[in-house]
Structure formats: C-alpha cells, structure tokens
Regions:
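Acidic, heptad-repeat coiled-coil helices used for dimerization/signal transmission
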Residues: 17-20, 24-120, 141
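Extracytoplasmic/periplasmic sensor domains and loops in membrane signaling proteins
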Residues: 124-132, 165-203
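Short, small/polar residue-rich loop motifs at catalytic or cofactor-binding pockets
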Residues: 142-145, 213-214
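Short hydrophobic alpha-helical segments used for membrane anchoring or interfacial signaling
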Residues: 147-154, 160
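Hydrophobic beta-strand positions
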Residues: 150, 219-220
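A short beta-strand signature within small-molecule sensing/ligand-binding domains used
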Residues: 199-200, 210-219
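Short hydrophobic/glycine-rich mini-motifs in sensory/regulatory modules
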Residues: 221-230
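Helix-start (N-cap) segments at beta->loop->alpha junctions
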Residues: 232-236
Length: 236
C-alpha cells in the first residue's frame, strides 16, 4: 500500500511538473525569473507531502488540460489590455484632461479614516472616468478573470473594478474585500506588476483575501514612457 501510494504521488508530481514545464515554455521570455521557477518545478517530485497544496495551483488530468487553455490565452489578453490602457492615457493627455507630469506624479495624498490606507493622486479622478469601461469589458468577456486593473510603478491602483469599489461601510472586514481601490499593493507580487518591462509576467500567489490566484501583467507605456502595468488576476 505504501509503495502504491508513493507511485501515485510520483505520477501526480510528474503531471504537475509537466504542467509547470508547459507554462514555463509559454513564458520563456520571462528570462531569469522563468528559469528559476522551472528549476524549482523540476524538484517537485520529491515534495509529495505538499501535493495537496500544489494541486490546488496546478490541476491534474482533464482539469489540468482545461486550465492550460486558460493560461495560454492570457498573455495576448493582458498585452492587448495594456496597449489599450496606454492609448486611453495618451488620448487624455492629448485632449488636455491632464498633463504627463500629473500622470507620473507619485506624491499620493492619504485619504483620511481609511484602513488599509487609501490615497488620492493627481490622476485618479481621470482614471475613475476612463478605466472602468476597459476593465469591465475584459471582466465581462472572460469569466475566469477575477480582477483587471491598472497599476503604476509603485503598486498604486487608482481605480479598481466596480465589484471591488463598493461604498465604504466602516466595517474593516467588509471594506477590505469590497473596496480595494486607491490602495498601494506593495506585496512582492503587487510590486512587480507595475515595475517589470517584460512582455508579460505570470505570478501565482495567495491573495491577502486567502484565495490562490494567478496574476499576469504587462507594461503600460504612455508616449514612450513606462507608466506601470496592466494586471489581470484569474483562476485556472
């Protein structure tokens, strides 16, 4: 029975490694980060004790194949979203709705009586007007997507999705989940989303709300300058 269990774990680990290899092939352009992740993935066969947790991220069998179809379509979606977001910001600057200096200003102003702390900026009133249509359209057409947001290079998200921009209630637990707009997400994953300039970056992490999430981001450029990133969180 023990030998059979070991063989089963080994087969499951092989499947997980296979899926990770596929993902790493897809994101090979992620350079050193991808190579490090692939190196770590090849050692998963020795981590049978963690298979239950690992399998929550990399699904097996038919479910795993279905998940791979989701992973494979995300790079094109996020890069197109980043391109459109950059165009929206360029059009706003060209139309005199704000200056380039306003958009790249990071002297955020704390919004009183908010916890976690929220911030206003010289550009969030604009993004509140122009981001929701783009972000909402992507959410509506991709049911596996949980969030689709723009972030500057510091992890500041000026305008979150409507589902995560509910009116503040004063109840910390409710607001923590229901209103995530205008926060600086400076966790290790959030910091990378706006800083990197790779074609796209896929990260898998446990969200601060407890969910395991895949996050893919692509850089947003405005008149040739790197403003931040377009960030998509999805389940697969």
């Amino acid at each position: 029975a023990i030998a059979a269990a070991i063989n089963t774990h080994s087969r499951e680990a092989d499947q997980i490694v296979g899926h990770v290899r596929q993902i790493m092939d897809m994101v090979g352009r992620n350079s050193a980060g991808a190579k490090e992740t692939l190196s770590e993935a090849t050692s998963l066969s020795g981590l049978a004790v963690n298979l239950k947790e690992i399998s929550r991220v990399f699904k097996l069998g038919a479910a795993g194949e279905l998940a791979m179809t989701v992973h494979k379509k995300m790079p094109d979606i996020v890069r197109d979203g980043a391109r459109q977001m950059g165009m929206l910001l360029e059009q706003a600057i060209a139309g005199g709705q704000l200056s380039e200096a306003d958009l790249f200003d990071d002297a955020y102003r704390p919004i009183p009586n908010t916890r976690p702390q929220k911030y206003s900026s010289r550009f969030d009133s604009l993004t509140d007007r122009i981001f929701p249509v783009l972000q909402g359209r992507l959410l509506d057409s991709n049911p596996e997507v949980v969030y689709a947001i723009g972030t500057d290079q510091n992890g500041y998200v000026p305008t979150h999705n409507k589902r995560f921009s509910q009116p503040l209630t004063g109840d910390y637990d409710k607001d923590f989940v229901g209103n995530r707009s205008k926060r600086v997400f400076d966790d290790p994953v959030g910091k990378q989303c706006g800083k990197h300039e790779m074609p796209f970056l896929i990260q898998t992490y446990r969200r601060d709300t407890g969910e395991i999430m895949h996050d893919i981001s692509a850089p947003v450029y405005v008149n040739g300058r790197h403003w931040g990133g377009f960030r998509i969180g999805y389940r697969a």
